[in-house]
């Protein structure tokens, strides 16, 4: 979305989004999944506009269809407020080499402070800043939605113009939160970055956890649309929408 203070016509964009969704069908629930980059640079004024945009979306949905959407959102790298200070790949690699500490994580979480206000308003990431699990009942179908923060240790304005694939981090002890519960019929995982953006150790564990516990993976970041299926040697698979 990359909402910023120079954006115009947000109300019209909300109307177009609503028209793209066929709400004349008798849905049991109306859920909007946002795969990150709500803001352009993680600043407070950008989230004020995001509140306005989604407020318009909800109001028009209620007015035209009598349905209030539930909004689930994950952060992207544009949802981080770097306070206009650059962070290079070499700096991130230094943090990874020394081992992630609790202070490192607290510092990372703090960079999302204005995003958390927006996410918490939508009942997301209230208890954990890395993974949030939602359970939705659709008639006789029970759906688990895993929200993953894939943007920890993102770079910003790297002077070497280097991309940060292979740098991102997720706490290995948090991955049990995406475990598909026994009574779940269908599992959806949503995160902003594809798995290749994570550091090698994180990538292996995250990919295995997703493969074992996810039926549908929704990604952002790459700015190109594609749908594909990933299969393992033991027959496990999931569909990815990017």
Give the role of each language-model region.
Residues 1-3, 142-156, 188-192, 238-242:
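Active-site-proximal beta-strand elements of phosphoester/diester hydrolases
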Residues 1-71, 81-82, 175-183:
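N-terminal active-site segment of His-dependent metallophosphoesterases
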Residues 4, 40-43, 79-84, 153-156, ...:
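Short catalytic/ligand-binding loop motif for oxyanion handling, primarily in non-cytosolic enzymes
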Residues 30-31, 70, 143-145, 186-188, ...:
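Structural motif
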Residues 36-37, 76, 148, 192, ...:
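Active-site glycine-centered loops adjacent to acidic/histidine catalytic or metal-binding residues
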Residues 51-166:
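Extended active-site neighborhood of metal-dependent phosphoesterases/phosphodiesterases
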Residues 181-197:
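Short acidic, glycine-rich surface-loop motifs adjacent to enzyme active sites
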Residues 196-242:
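Conserved beta-sheet core of the metallophosphoesterase superfamily
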């Amino acid at each position: 979305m990359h909402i910023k203070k120079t954006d115009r016509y947000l109300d019209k964009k909300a109307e177009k989004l609503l028209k793209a969704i066929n709400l004349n069908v008798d849905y049991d629930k109306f859920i909007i999944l946002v795969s990150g980059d709500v803001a352009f640079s993680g600043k407070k004024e950008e989230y004020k506009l995001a509140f306005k945009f989604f407020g318009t979306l909800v109001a028009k949905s209620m007015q035209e269809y009598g349905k209030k959407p539930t909004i689930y959102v994950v952060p992207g790298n544009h949802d981080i407020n770097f306070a206009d200070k650059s962070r290079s790949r070499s700096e991130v690699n230094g943090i990874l080499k020394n081992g992630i500490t609790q202070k490192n994580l607290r510092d990372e979480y703090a960079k999302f402070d204005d995003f958390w206000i927006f996410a918490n308003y939508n009942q997301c990431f209230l208890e954990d800043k890395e993974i949030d699990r939602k359970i939705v009942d659709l008639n006789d179908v029970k759906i688990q939605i895993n929200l993953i923060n894939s943007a920890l240790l993102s770079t910003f304005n790297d002077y070497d113009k280097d991309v940060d694939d292979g740098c991102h981090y997720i706490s290995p002890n948090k991955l049990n939160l995406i475990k598909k519960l026994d009574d779940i019929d269908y599992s959806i995982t949503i995160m902003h970055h594809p798995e290749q953006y994570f550091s090698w150790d994180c990538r292996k564990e995250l990919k295995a956890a997703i493969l074992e516990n996810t039926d549908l993976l929704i990604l952002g970041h790459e700015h190109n649309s594609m749908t594909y299926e990933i299969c393992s040697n033991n027959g496990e698979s999931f569909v990815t929408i990017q």
